[in-house]
């Protein structure tokens, strides 16, 4: 598990999209780091259209064809509350339809935190445990 932590509007989602596209397409990340090629499940909790535009721009930059039939990048159909078991189970149902998931992106923490206090150890612990659960199942 890795977290991209920085103030708002500093490019965290750009980095996540870049990494996700590299893994989904089996290309070295930043032409320097080897990746394990496979499916990526991207949980989009804000800016769905912005993420799609960034993915399209990434494909143009790296001259990689983007088609529904060949993409390994899968987007959630709904938001996620990572502190609510029913929300997590609904997301898992969608994820189980995809084989060989190598990366799960949760974008953003604030929107998937379910009204918890990010500074409260109990709330953050619950969030991390539920992320661990996703990671271990997939």
Predicted regions and their residues:
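Short hydrophobic/aromatic beta-strand immediately N-terminal to the Walker A/P-loop
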Residues: 2-5, 41
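Conserved glycine(s) of the Walker
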Residues: 11
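The conserved Walker
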Residues: 8
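Hydrophobic positions on the alpha1 helix immediately C-terminal to the Walker A/P-loop
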Residues: 15, 19
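Gly/Ala-rich phosphate-binding loop of Rossmann-like dinucleotide-binding domains
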Residues: 24
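Sensor-1/coupling segment of RecA-like P-loop NTPase cores
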Residues: 135-138
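Conserved inter-motif catalytic segment of the P-loop NTP-binding fold
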Residues: 28, 34-129, 133
């Amino acid at each position: 598990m890795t977290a991209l932590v920085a103030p708002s509007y500093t490019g965290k989602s750009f980095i996540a999209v870049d990494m996700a596209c590299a893994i989904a397409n089996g290309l070295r990340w930043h032409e320097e780091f080897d990746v394990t090629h496979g499916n990526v499940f991207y949980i989009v909790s804000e800016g769905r259209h912005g993420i799609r535009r960034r993915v399209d721009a990434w494909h143009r930059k790296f001259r990689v064809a983007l088609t529904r039939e060949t993409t390994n990048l899968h987007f959630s159909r709904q938001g996620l509350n990572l502190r609510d078991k029913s929300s997590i189970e609904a997301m898992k149902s969608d994820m189980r339809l995809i084989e060989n998931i190598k990366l799960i992106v949760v974008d953003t923490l604030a929107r998937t935190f379910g009204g918890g206090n990010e500074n409260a150890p109990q709330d953050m612990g619950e969030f991390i445990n539920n992320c661990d659960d996703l990671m271990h199942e997939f």
